[in-house]
């Protein structure tokens, strides 16, 4: 995917870049696979803000994505189109199954229009094919990996992400995650061969605040510029730095937001590298 840069005709356009959309083959989605998507503005049923920095944005329709693919084992499908999806960073591929059904999947890198893909334990090791981890050779690059058998893909679904299958150990497969974490996953879980396409999406420069508003992202205001009634860092004379360790608006220390005792933590072989230990 190429990145298209604008001429600097305005201050916002000077910094902007957009996707070239070279991979896409159709601009209109499959109507039968669309569902309405209602905006919440980050509010719950009582109208209280539960997620900050959400609201507005362009109207969207949700594309139904098949994250399981386990009920189509042995049924080949032809890639009819590669399409844009406003609800995710990756592109999506429209499959026409030979039994007449149509479904969307996450579009892997180098998946072309007209390619035939399939799912099942006996599927070939080919980009776009979906099969259990125990049937995939060690060293293969995969994406859209399940955490529980039949639970649907949960891992490596965003643009450019991938997981490497390092080996197999009893009833588990050993995976290297995009975060560099190494963990065990039930070998009956399914994965799709290849890495997610649209990898250059990370290099897009939004250029101006308005483009983020189109996406439904509202501004993030720093606590130190608020009043004391609004944030623990607020108040002070002049540009004060807060005078305490960083906390949330409700006084919780920043960082360490992950639950420390998840049941699946016992399957982690090696923790992810912290930022200070990552190679530059």
From Swiss-Prot:
GO terms for cellular component: large ribosomal subunit. Residues 23-33 have a biased composition (Basic and acidic residues). Residues 36-59, 269-280 have a biased composition (Basic residues). Keywords: Ribonucleoprotein, Ribosomal protein, RNA-binding, rRNA-binding. The keyword Ribonucleoprotein applies. SUPFAM superfamilies: Nucleic acid-binding proteins, Translation proteins SH3-like domain. SMART domains: Ribosomal_L2 (SM01383), Ribosomal_L2_C (SM01382). Coiled coil: none annotated. Part of the 50S ribosomal subunit. Forms a bridge to the 30S subunit in the 70S ribosome. This is Large ribosomal subunit protein uL2.
């Amino acid at each position: 995917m190429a990145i298209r840069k604008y001429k600097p005709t305005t201050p916002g356009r000077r910094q902007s870049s957009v996707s070239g959309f070279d991979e896409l083959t159709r601009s209109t989605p499959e109507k039968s696979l669309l569902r309405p998507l209602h905006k919440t503005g980050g509010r719950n049923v009582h109208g209280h803000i539960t997620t900050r920095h959400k609201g507005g944005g362009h109207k969207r329709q949700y594309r139904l994505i098949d994250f399981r693919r386990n009920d189509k084992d042995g049924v080949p499908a032809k890639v009819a189109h590669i399409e844009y999806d406003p609800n995710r960073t990756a592109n999506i591929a429209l499959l026409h199954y030979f039994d007449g059904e149509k479904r969307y999947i996450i579009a892997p890198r180098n998946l072309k229009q007209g390619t035939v893909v399939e799912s099942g334990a006996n599927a070939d090791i080919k980009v776009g094919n979906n099969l259990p981890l125990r049937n995939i050779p060690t060293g293969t690059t995969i994406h859209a990996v399940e955490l529980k058998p039949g639970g649907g893909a949960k891992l490596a679904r965003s643009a450019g992400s991938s997981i490497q299958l390092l080996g197999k150990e009893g009833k588990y497969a050993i995976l290297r995650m995009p975060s560099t974490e190494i963990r065990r996953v039930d070998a009956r879980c399914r994965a799709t061969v290849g890495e997610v396409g649209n990898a250059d999406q990370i290099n897009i420069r939004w250029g101006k605040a308005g483009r983020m508003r189109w996406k439904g992202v509202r501004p993030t205001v720093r606590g130190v510029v608020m009043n004391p009634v609004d944030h623990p860092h607020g108040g002070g004379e002049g540009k004060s730095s807060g005078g305490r360790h960083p906390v949330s608006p409700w006084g919780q220390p920043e960082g360490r937001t992950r639950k420390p005792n998840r049941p699946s933590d016992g399957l982690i072989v090696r923790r992810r590298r912290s930022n200070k230990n990552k190679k530059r």
